[in-house]
């Protein structure tokens, strides 16, 4: 075993520290005597909190500075939420392990404990995600969507203070924080697709660091990997980022991998969905096929309009 101190690059939010702390604890349990420490890196997404993500522009808003630290060798690995990781990684970096996925669904959290169907006419829903906003508008065209940025505890506090009637969050974040009791209702992916990679954690490292890759190998979950690979293949096909309402969810049941994908217009008036199933060995092809079906069915026009805006 290595004598190195393994430095994990992480964002500084409570949730990010919980996720990276879980990886640290798992590595230390697997490799007794291994020294692992967390190193907080502030990202662009952490610094700009008063602008919707779609208007900030660019890709990798929550990972770029951590990847820069990896390439500069000031950290040895990085723990990311896979939904934040761009479809194409920087040269010299790879995802070394993807542990077992948490619940990938979105959830509604309301002040009254009532679900989305019971919100008042013109109710105010907080989210900074175009994907979530588009799908909510499809379900409830009367709803007012208001920008909501900040970490998970800030979002919950703003809801409690009355700034919103409801907010939409990732189930995985609430679960990892032990705050399942805050969930009002889970949004079924059959009606409301999550973000690409949502609920999955990716551990990124330098391609030339075989020592760290070996340490991470026992943390890797093959079933989660093939599901996320299919979703990310869809994302690459659509060339999407934070600026576009794209959703995707893949799951493996009895040896069959099924992927559903979605592209919506900003106003939610147009929403295209497609799905394919096949062998896990075809994960990338399934992602490409779903992406091409979406593009050919009308999503290409929507994406071109968004990119021109």
Swiss-Prot record:
Cofactor(s) the record lists: dipyrromethane
CDD domains assigned: PBP2_EcHMBS_like
Pathway stated in the Swiss-Prot or TrEMBL entry: Porphyrin-containing compound metabolism; protoporphyrin-IX biosynthesis; coproporphyrinogen-III from 5-aminolevulinate: step 2/4
Keyword Plastid listed: no
Pfam families (alphabetical): Porphobil_deam, Porphobil_deamC
Record field: catalytic activity: 4 porphobilinogen + H2O = hydroxymethylbilane + 4 NH4(+)
EC number: 2.5.1.61
Cellular component GO terms held in the UniProt record: cytoplasm
Keywords: Porphyrin biosynthesis, Transferase
Function: Tetrapolymerization of the monopyrrole PBG into the hydroxymethylbilane pre-uroporphyrinogen in several discrete steps.
Miscellaneous: The porphobilinogen subunits are added to the dipyrromethane group.
Record's protein name: Porphobilinogen deaminase
């Amino acid at each position: 075993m290595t004598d190195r101190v393994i430095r994990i690059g992480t964002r500084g939010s409570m949730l990010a520290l919980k996720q990276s702390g879980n990886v640290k604890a798992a590595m230390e349990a697997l490799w007794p005597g291994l020294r692992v420490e967390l190193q907080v890196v502030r990202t662009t997404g952490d610094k700009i909190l008063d602008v919707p993500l779609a208007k900030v522009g660019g890709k990798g808003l929550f990972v770029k500075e951590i990847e820069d630290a990896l390439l500069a060798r000031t950290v040895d690995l990085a723990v990311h939420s896979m939904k934040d990781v761009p479809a194409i990684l920087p040269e010299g970096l790879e995802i070394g392990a993807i542990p077992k996925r948490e619940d990938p669904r979105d959830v509604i959290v309301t002040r009254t404990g009532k679900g989305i169907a019971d919100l008042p006419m013109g109710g105010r829903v907080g989210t900074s995600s175009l994907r979530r906003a588009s799908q909510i508008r499809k379900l409830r065209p009367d709803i007012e969507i208001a920008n909501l940025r900040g970490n998970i505890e800030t979002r919950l506090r703003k809801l409690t203070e009355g700034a919103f009637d409801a907010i939409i969050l990732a189930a995985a974040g609430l679960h990892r924080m032990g705050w399942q009791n805050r969930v009002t209702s889970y949004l079924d992916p059959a009606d409301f697709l999550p973000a690409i990679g949502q609920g999955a954690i990716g551990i990124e490292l330098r391609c030339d660091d075989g020592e760290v890759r070996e340490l991470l190998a026992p943390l890797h979950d093959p079933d989660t990997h093939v599901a996320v690979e299919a979703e990310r293949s869809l994302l690459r096909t659509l060339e999407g980022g934070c600026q576009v309402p794209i959703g995707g969810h893949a799951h493996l049941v009895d040896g069959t991998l099924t992927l559903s994908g979605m592209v919506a217009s900003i106003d939610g008036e147009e929403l295209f969905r497609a799905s394919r199933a096949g062998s896990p060995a075809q994960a990338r092809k399934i992602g490409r096929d779903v992406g091409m079906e979406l593009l050919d069915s009308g999503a290409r026009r929507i994406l071109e309009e968004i990119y021109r805006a």
